[in-house]
């Protein structure tokens, strides 16, 4: 049951997120693939939305497939800008330039 939200899965996802280097971003889909859940990018988003309950993780480094930040995570863009990540005029991260090469 790979789609079951359990503590092991949560920490597996968060351990991958911890590996994203400063100055880089990953997509929900990348994290899903790296955890063996290729078709579960939304599940990754759900886990990251609850990450504060599990400690300090750099979840601000995860964006959607187009480079958009998470709605409702108002500090995300500021944190990325502080790390030197630039945004295109459309408000998205330039994934060709800043995507984590994992």
Model features per residue range: what roles?
Residues 2-102:
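Nucleic acid-binding interface residues in structured DNA/RNA-binding domains
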């Amino acid at each position: 049951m790979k789609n079951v939200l359990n503590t092991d899965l949560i920490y597996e996802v968060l351990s991958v997120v911890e590996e994203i280097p400063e100055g880089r971003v990953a997509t929900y889909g990348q994290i899903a693939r790296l955890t063996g859940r290729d078709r579960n990018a939304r599940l990754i988003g759900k886990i990251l939305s609850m990450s504060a309950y599990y400690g300090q993780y750099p979840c601000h480094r995860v964006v959607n497939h187009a480079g958009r930040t998470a709605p409702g995570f108002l500090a995300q863009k500021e944190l990325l800008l502080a790390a030197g990540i630039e945004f295109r005029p459309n408000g998205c991260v330039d994934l060709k330039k800043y995507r984590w090469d994992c």
